[in-house]
Each structure stands twice: as C-alpha cells, then as structure tokens.
C-alpha cells in the first residue's frame, strides 16, 4: 500500500499522556507509505471548519522533533469538543470539509479521539461513501475511559489507570495516620464504564490494603 496523495490528521476530545505518540505514529507511517504532505488540523474538526490547517512537514522536519513529540503532554495540534450534525439535517459542514479535502488533495483522514471523535470520523466516512469519494477515513482510538468497542486497551487508559492507583494509594496512606477514623469517597472518571474505577484496586500492595469498596456502573449496588 502507498499513499501518493496527502494525509490529514487531527486530535479531539480530552488529551491523554500518549495522544501525541499516536500523532507521531500517523505521521511516520504516512511518510513511510509515500504521502507527499501530512497536514494537521488545528483544534480538531472545529478548527478545520475555520480553515486552521498546518503542514506538519514544516514542524516535524527531523527525527529529534518526532521523538520529542512522542513524549510531549497534552494535544500538540489542539483539540475541540465538537460534534458534526446529521448530514440529512445539515449538510453544510460536510460540503465545506470535502471542499477543503479537495483543495489540499487529501487521500486519507485520521482522527485521534474517543467516542465523539469516532462518531465524527464515521459520519465523514459514510458521507464520503454516499458521494462516491475515494478518501479513506480512519479513527485512531484515544480515551482514558477504555470504552471503545472492539478495543481491548485504548491508548491513554494505562496511563490514567496508573495515575488513579498511585493517587488512591497516597490518599489511603494519608487517611490512616489519624486516630479518628474517617470515610473517604473518591469519584473516578470513566463516563458509563468502570475500567478506571476498577483500576483503583491496583493501589493494593505490601504497603496498602487498597480501597475497601469499589463501585462499578456495570454492577448494581
């Protein structure tokens, strides 16, 4: 497989510790497969609709820059929380986006994100197929919630799970120093899934018994 045309990549939703590693991976793979240019959306699909697009070849012009990107926190290209409408209801943003794809000779679009980002790339793919477009639309999973279907461990989940286990261990140890007993309740992110809450069990070890109770949305309490 080779990509003789240009590639476009964007980031969306909340940043994770490894979202820029995925961006670096897309860039390196696209160049290895012959992409003439790799463009980046600034501030996701919302920024793209405002014409905010950069040539990543100008920014990632040597190996050191790419290696630094892999270890850079937050979202290098910026992010957004923007959902595309149903094209049957409002086709205007789709027309605008496909005009931009044509202007920059885009042959493949990568969108790095979670549930809403996958919804965006799915809508673009369906719209393109309906219009006979040959552009390939590819979703790159990213979510600390670990709640994307058919994905065992989403990039970002492991880092968040480790962070939660570390924080809970510190909270438990701090709470144990007082003679007066207390009850501490920690509310963990995760949308509608309990993967992150379950990761709190990793706080248990030789120096800590871990949480007394872990409540998961999948199990009634």
Task: State what each model feature region is.
Residues 1, 51-107, 116, 144, ...:
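Glycine-rich oxoanion-binding loops at beta->alpha junctions
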Residues 2-7, 33-36, 71-74, 104-108, ...:
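Short coil/turn connectors at secondary-structure junctions
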Residues 140-153, 180:
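Acidic/polar active-site rim loop that often engages polyanionic ligands
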Residues 2-53:
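N-terminal phosphate-binding or glycine-rich loops at protein starts, especially the Walker A/P-loop
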Residues 6-16, 75-81, 107-113, 139, ...:
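Short glycine-rich or small-residue beta-strand-to-loop segments that form or flank ligand, phosphate
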Residues 100, 108-113, 119-134, 154-221:
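Accessory alpha-helical/coil subdomains and C-terminal extensions
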């Amino acid at each position: 497989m080779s990509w003789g045309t240009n590639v476009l990549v964007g980031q969306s939703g909340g940043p994770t510790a490894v979202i820029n590693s995925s961006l670096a991976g897309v860039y390196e793979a696209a160049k290895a497969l012959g992409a003439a240019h790799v463009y980046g959306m600034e501030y996701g699909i919302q920024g793209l609709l405002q014409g905010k697009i950069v040539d990543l070849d100008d920014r990632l012009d040597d190996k050191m820059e790419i290696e630094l990107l892999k270890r850079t926190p937050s979202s290098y290209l910026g992010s957004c929380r923007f959902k595309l409408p149903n094209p049957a209801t409002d086709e205007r943003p789709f027309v605008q986006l496909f005009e931009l794809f044509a202007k920059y000779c885009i042959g493949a679009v990568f969108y790095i994100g979670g549930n809403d980002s996958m919804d965006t790339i799915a809508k673009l793919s369906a719209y393109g197929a309906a219009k006979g477009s040959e552009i390939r639309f590819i979703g790159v999973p990213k979510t600390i919630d670990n709640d994307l279907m058919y994905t065992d461990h989403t990039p970002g989940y492991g880092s968040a799970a480790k962070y939660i286990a570390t924080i809970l261990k510190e909270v438990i140890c701090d709470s144990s120093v007082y003679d007066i007993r207390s009850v501490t309740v920690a509310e963990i992110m995760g949308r509608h899934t309990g993967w992150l809450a379950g990761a709190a069990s990793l706080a248990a070890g030789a120096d800590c018994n871990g949480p007394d109770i872990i409540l998961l949305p999948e199990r009634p309490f």
